[in-house]
């Protein structure tokens, strides 16, 4: 069978398919035309998230996201849902540490109505007090759900340990205390500060006409008198190593091991992505094979790489029987040491590259993924990043680059370890971590 080779340039990746317009007030409008599809994915993004919140504001970005679908000057919450359902549209929103997005996907012929609904949600939310009280209770339940889900709760505990004095280490949801204090004044003040033109990005991907898109959104954003604010600058996150063990009566112990990693703009991020794939990013990865397939010590075990604008986190997660905790830690450390000492073949690296590249191209066939990718690249690089440019950067990574990355990430004293389950710190073999800390 002949080997399949990706075409040098797919028709929908030509630069002319990607357009960008900057309005007079700084709002950016970006489109990626995919003429082979019938759908359009549209997102209105704000370059703000939980890392921009003060301790008292923690969770306000997420609260705003929830409230935006509850009603506007022109539509009730029910009317928003009814209008979307009437055109077979899918719509949602999400809040991250650095961005907030309100998005939807419809047939291309229904794009004008989706644009009208999302811009109405974004520009004219009402934030009625009775709606706020109901949604506050919903968010309380969301917080409780996370705290009742061990791996999610451990993730929160780990981030507090890793970024102890920075908002990036706090929960996107906020806490019961901060959410309980939020009112209309706090929400409107946050919007005034951060929902400003230079932080706003409108992105569409699919069978969309850029000129018509600009024609619609220009009057929406250039004529709104309340669309201005302060634009506070972000502070650089400082990381912390250490140990945090939280005792809880569970069947398993859940483990997080993590350290500093490259940011979105660091050239070494490609080596880190490949290191992640090789160590614990798929079913043939070293941790999955050794811990799950060969030893049967865990059902869920993986590594992850989370880059941000100016920092990053590389981590390993496993859920295991408390009796096997130290064995899992020892295997994890051994596999990391093997890579940091050069035990990586050219064929293994080539397979990891193909895995990453293949995954990128597979997701490129979704208009939602294309829209989100275009937004990320505009926020980070202020331009469209061609797929071939990414492939070339991945292909340039050498065995030595991955080996150096493994050593850089886990070869210092900023390693953080968090565990949740029926254990205490005395149960952890700290020698496997080369760390010391205080249990809680």
Segments predicted by a language model, with ranges:
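N- or domain-start disorder-to-order transition segments that initiate the globular core
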Residues: 4-39
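M16/MPP (pitrilysin/insulinase) zinc-metallopeptidase core fold and M16-derived inactive scaffolds
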Residues: 41-105, 281-297, 308
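Catalytic cores of enzymes that engage adenine nucleotides and/or redox cofactors via long glycine-rich
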Residues: 236-239, 290
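A short acidic-to-branched-hydrophobic micro-motif
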Residues: 42-46, 118, 255
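A conserved active-site cap/scaffold subdomain adjacent to cofactor or substrate pockets
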Residues: 264-267, 271-281, 287
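Charge-rich, well-structured scaffold segments of protease-associated domains
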Residues: 2-7, 22, 33, 77-229, ...
């Amino acid at each position: 069978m002949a080997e399949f080779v990706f075409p040098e340039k797919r028709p929908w990746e030509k630069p002319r398919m990607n357009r960008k317009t900057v309005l007079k007030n700084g709002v950016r409008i970006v489109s990626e035309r995919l003429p082979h599809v019938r759908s359009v994915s549209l997102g209105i993004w704000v370059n703000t998230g939980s890392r921009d919140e003060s301790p008292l504001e923690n969770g306000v970005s997420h609260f705003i996201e929830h409230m935006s679908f509850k009603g506007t000057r022109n539509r009730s919450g029910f009317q928003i849902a009814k209008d979307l359902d009437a055109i077979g549209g899918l719509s949602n929103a999400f809040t991250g540490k650095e961005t907030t997005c309100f998005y939807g996907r419809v047939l291309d012929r229904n794009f004008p109505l989706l644009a009208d609904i999302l811009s109405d949600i974004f520009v004219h939310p009402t934030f009625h007090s009775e709606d706020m009280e109901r949604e506050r209770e919903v968010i309380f339940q969301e917080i409780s759900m996370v705290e009742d889900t061990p791996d999610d709760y451990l993730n929160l505990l780990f981030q507090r340990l890793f970024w102890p004095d920075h908002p990036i280490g706090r929960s996107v949801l906020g806490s019961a205390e901060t959410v309980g204090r939020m009112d209309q004044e706090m929400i409107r003040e946050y919007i005034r500060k951060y929902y400003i033109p230079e932080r706003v990005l409108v992105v569409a991907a699919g069978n969309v006409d850029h000129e018509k898109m600009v024609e619609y959104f220009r009057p929406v954003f250039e004529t709104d008198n309340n669309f201005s604010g302060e634009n506070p600058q972000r502070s650089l996150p400082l990381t912390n190593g250490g140990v945090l063990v939280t005792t809880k009566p569970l069947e398993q112990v859940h483990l997080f091991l993590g350290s500093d990693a490259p940011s979105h703009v660091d050239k070494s991020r490609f080596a880190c992505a490949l290191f992640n794939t090789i160590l614990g990013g798929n079913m043939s990865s070293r941790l999955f094979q050794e811990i799950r397939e060969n030893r049967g010590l865990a059902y869920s075990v993986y590594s992850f790489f989370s880059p941000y604008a100016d920092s990053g986190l590389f981590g390993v997660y496993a859920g295991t029987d408390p009796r096997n905790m130290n064995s899992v830690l020892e295997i994890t450390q051994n596999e990391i040491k093997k890579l940091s000492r050069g035990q990586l073949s050219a064929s293994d690296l080539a397979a990891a590259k193909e895995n990453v590249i293949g995954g990128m191209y597979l997701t490129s066939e979704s208009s939602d993924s294309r829209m989100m990718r275009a937004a990320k690249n505009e926020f980070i690089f202020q331009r469209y990043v061609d797929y071939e440019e990414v492939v070339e950067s991945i292909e340039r990574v050498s065995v030595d680059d991955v080996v150096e990355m493994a050593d850089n990430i886990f070869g210092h004293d900023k390693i953080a370890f968090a565990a949740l389950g029926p254990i205490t710190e005395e149960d952890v073999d700290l020698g496997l971590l080369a760390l010391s800390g205080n249990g809680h």
